């Protein structure tokens, strides 16, 4: 039996983890800069906040590309093969990753273009929580498939 029947090719795995790491790091850095006491000068935002968001947005474009790559190859192949093998438990975490990716894309779009000021903080925290959850789920999903 093949040990890693539907494992991502090396370039996809590296690109996915690198993109995810940049998105997670820039998102968490923005939270620290924005909400940490003394992080900003009074009412003015920290000078690095804008650059952090620009890098986060750039990484998000790469993340959407990688989501498309994975959705086009890994997801269908993994779905078909997991029904016949011991990797059926991977379906749940794979579906959760797809749902979180869609939620992050939608909430990021809403935050950037449409979020009213009254909803912006709650939507931002939901986006942040989903991002951290997706990072944890991605590591868990990858480790399960390598076992």
PLM regions: where:
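Membrane-embedded alpha-helical bundles that constitute the cytochrome b-like, heme-associated redox core
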Residues: 1-147
């Amino acid at each position: 039996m093949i040990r890693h029947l539907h494992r991502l090719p090396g370039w996809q795995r590296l690109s996915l983890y690198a993109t995810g790491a940049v998105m997670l790091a820039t998102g968490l850095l923005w939270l620290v800069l924005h909400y940490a006491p003394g992080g900003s000068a009074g009412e003015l935002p920290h000078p690095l906040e804008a650059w952090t968001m620009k890098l986060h947005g750039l990484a998000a474009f790469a993340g959407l590309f990688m989501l498309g790559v994975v959705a086009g190859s890994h997801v269908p192949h993994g779905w078909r093969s997991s029904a016949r093998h011991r990797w059926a438990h991977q379906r749940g975490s794979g579906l959760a990753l797809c749902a979180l990716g869609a939620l992050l894309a939608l909430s990021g779009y809403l935050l950037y273009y449409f979020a009213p000021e009254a909803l912006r903080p709650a939507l931002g925290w939901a986006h942040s929580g989903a991002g951290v959850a997706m990072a944890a789920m991605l590591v868990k999903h990858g480790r399960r498939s390598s076992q």
